[in-house]
Amino acid sequence: MDFYYSPRSSGSRTIIMVAKALGLELNKKQLRITEGEHLKPEFLKLNPQHTIPTLVDNGFAIWESRAIAVYLVEKYGKDDSLFPNDPQKRALINQRLYFDMGTLHDSFMKYYYPFIRTGQLGNAENYKKVEAAFEFLDIFLEGQDYVAGSQLTVADIAILSSVSTFEVVEFDISKYPNVARWYANAKKITPGWDENWKGLLQMKTMYEAQKASLK
């Protein structure tokens, strides 16, 4: 299956880890967004929203990383451990995935991402949203080893991708002890972590370059 991605993208890194957990091989096609490769006609035919990641599986194109993750585990999972069939367990996983998209990852994009692109951080209100997102996640993880239930699921993998992104921009995760505990364990047990970190190092290079340019 063809996988259009950027190694710096948290959504792309999520899918790389999910595929690793499932034992799937992805035919990776890196798109250079800064060079407009996502706007080429052949890619727009696959994804008119021209977003990454995008997966094409036997002619079926799907984008939005959390939708891709769920598709992969439902179609290719040897069991339902990453996305249980039980309606309540599945609902909790979906809630965490939506939390990641709409709250946690969104707070990164509004506060830190502008700095990586332009050297200008978001405003103080946006930073408060980062703190609030981690406070919520810390509550979710009180007395829990995983973000949604008693085992590793796609929600852990997606949130691991997001939380690790905050690490490379020097956000102090240690202020949230439950998150820090979960994060240390998730890095050890999640398949594909090394490739996730490899992609993050590219983002870290961009972040450090922006910091240096402001000195």
Curated annotation (Swiss-Prot):
Question: What function is annotated for this protein?
Answer: Conjugation of reduced glutathione to a wide number of exogenous and endogenous hydrophobic electrophiles. May be involved in detoxification.
Q: Which Gene3D superfamilies match?
A: 1.20.1050.10, Glutaredoxin (3.40.30.10)
What are the residue boundaries of the GST C-terminal domain, all occurrences included?
86-207
The chemistry this enzyme catalyses reads:
RX + glutathione = an S-substituted glutathione + a halide anion + H(+)
| Protein family per UniProt | Belongs to the GST superfamily. Delta family.
- PROSITE patterns linked to this entry: GST_CTER, GST_NTER
**What biological-process GO terms show up in the record?**
glutathione metabolic process; response to toxic substance
* Top EC category: transferase
Q: What is the lineage of its organism?
A: Eukaryota, Metazoa, Ecdysozoa, Arthropoda, Hexapoda
Could you state a single Gene Ontology molecular function term? glutathione transferase activity
Identify this protein by name.
Answer: Glutathione S-transferase D4
- EC number from the UniProt entry: 2.5.1.18
Q: What's in the GO CC field? A: cytoplasm
User: Taking every annotated instance into account, which residue ranges of this chain make up the domain GST N-terminal?
Assistant: 1-80
Entry keywords, A to Z: Detoxification, Transferase
Organism superkingdom:
Eukaryota
Complexes and interactors? Homodimer.
User: Is DNA damage tagged as a keyword?
Assistant: no
Q: Which gene encodes it?
A: GstD4
InterPro entries in the record: Glutathione-S-Trfase_C-like, Glutathione-S-Trfase_C_sf, Glutathione_S-Trfase_N, GST_C, Thioredoxin-like_sf
Binding positions for glutathione per the UniProt entry: S9, H50, T51, I52, E64, S65, R66
